Amino acid sequence: PYVVVKPMSGGFNAADAGFLGPKYGALMIGDGKLPPGLARPDDLSAADDADRNDLRKLADRRYAAGRRPGNTEANAAAFEMAAQLQKNVALFDVSKLPPAERDRYGTHDLGRDLLIARRLLEAGVTFVKVTSYGWDTHGDNFNGHASLMPKFDRPFAAMIQDL
């Protein structure tokens, strides 16, 4: 699975992988926040969480026996990615970064999303897609893009420089 940072989305999208199959579907992260339920509750210890995941894996193996492998593999891949992200929830909290680093990316949503994408890539996520809306301006392209470019230029340049 890969990660998509897309406004107004969240959860696992198995259909996004097309002919590759649901195992390679995207984990959708919307509005720069973790998908609901991804973070381990404070009252659940890491050991108890690991035991719970081991039990889930056992149930998954039993469930998968005799069923179509694509869907069960997709669920298993989504849970594995979620387990890895649970260990790295701090990646999504850009508020704790130095102000100078945040300022390089700007204070708007696209800047935050690109900063999160950079942090995910640095943490080992192999593919991150960031979506930005409003570029399909049709009639007034030059003026429309003139207002969009500053929001894109600054964070994209910072991300390229950092990578």
Predicted regions and their residues:
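Ligand-binding pockets and gating/stacking loops
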Residues: P1-L163
